[in-house]
Amino acid sequence: MKKLDPIIEQFLDTLWLEQSLSHNTLLSYRLDLELFSAWLVEPRAFLTLTHTDLQLFLGDRLDKGYKSSSSARIISCLRKFFRFLCLEKYRLDDPTSMLISPRKRVQLPKSLSEEQVMDLLDAPNPLDPIELRDKAMLELLYATGLRVTELISLTIDNLNLRQGVVRVIGKGDKERLVPIGEEASYWIQEFFDYGRMILLSDQQSDVLFPSRRAKQMTRQTFWHRIKYYAILAGIDAEKLSPHVLRHAFATHLINHGADLRVVQMLLGHSDLSTTQIYTHVAKTRLKSIHKQFHPRG
């Protein structure tokens, strides 16, 4: 990883220590500050540059085709950075105070219909140990709305089949208990009884859904497995994302009248506004049904 200016490294260390940001967020900030540092003409020009200089930097990014969402993130990063510089007495003024974040276009998450989800869940062959594992994973994803990273990092100790719950360590190391339902419980038990020992052979693993090498599966590997089963189920790849079953979980709950705050708790969202996007998905679906079936639609 590229070594940055010691002041920038100090800033990133402070973020890690004081704000408990995720590894991916910290990495994004580091990459943004690498780009920013490369753009500066002189080393440590960030100690003297002005609001106008920052506008030129952001304008240069837009000219190169960066999206507004990317600009919004780097503005957020720069605001934190220059606030840090002021707090640590590296600067007296904050040139980001006048910056305006671009309006971020709301991206509706891609979701599947209930019929498509059933087709996807039915795609794995439960007679094959690997596909039985995948079947249990897909069922658990749809039953709980877990993030893929949360799913693949589950250990046996996180699961309580008798009580029908799974203990999840989410973003910011926040813990939540999520009910898993009868169908997912059944397939997890099937995997324990018939697939797991065959998959592991003589190896030992605490991972709930291990790879053939008894290790934790990677996000990329699981994403490839989802796409494989989607093809078998005849689902358009354009409708897919690694979190497709998480989105379906939330959308289908809201479609069936679930309280938004309950969905928020199940998903592990810290902010209700993050969950509210699924109400837009549900409304879009309702409008589509109305247009298709209402005589004056």
Swiss-Prot record:
Segments forming a coiled coil: none
InterPro entries: CB, DNA_brk_join_enz, Integrase-like_cat_sf, Integrase_catalytic, Integrase_recombinase_N, Integrase_SAM-like_N, Recomb_XerD, Tyrosine_recombinase_XerC/XerD
Keywords in alphabetical order: Cell cycle, Cell division, Chromosome partition, Cytoplasm, DNA integration, DNA recombination, DNA-binding
One GO BP annotation of this record: DNA transposition
The organism's place on the tree of life at top rank: Bacteria
Statement: the UniProt record of this protein carries the keyword Cell division: yes
GO CC, one annotated term: cytoplasm
Record-linked Pfam families: Phage_int_SAM_1 (PF02899), Phage_integrase (PF00589)
Subcellular location field: Cytoplasm
Key word Heme present: no
Active site annotation, chain numbering: 147, 171, 243, 246, 269, 278 (o-(3'-phospho-dna)-tyrosine intermediate)
Annotated Tyr recombinase domain residues: 107-291
GO molecular function: DNA binding; tyrosine-based site-specific recombinase activity
Ranges where the Core-binding (CB) domain occurs: 2-86
Principal location class: cytoplasm
Purpose: Site-specific tyrosine recombinase, which acts by catalyzing the cutting and rejoining of the recombining DNA molecules. The XerC-XerD complex is essential to convert dimers of the bacterial chromosome into monomers to permit their segregation at cell division. It also contributes to the segregational stability of plasmids.
Similarity annotation: Belongs to the 'phage' integrase family. XerD subfamily.
Subunit field text: Forms a cyclic heterotetrameric complex composed of two molecules of XerC and two molecules of XerD.
PANTHER family: PHAGE INTEGRASE-RELATED, TYROSINE RECOMBINASE XERD
Protein name according to UniProt: Tyrosine recombinase XerD
Organism: Haemophilus ducreyi (strain 35000HP / ATCC 700724)
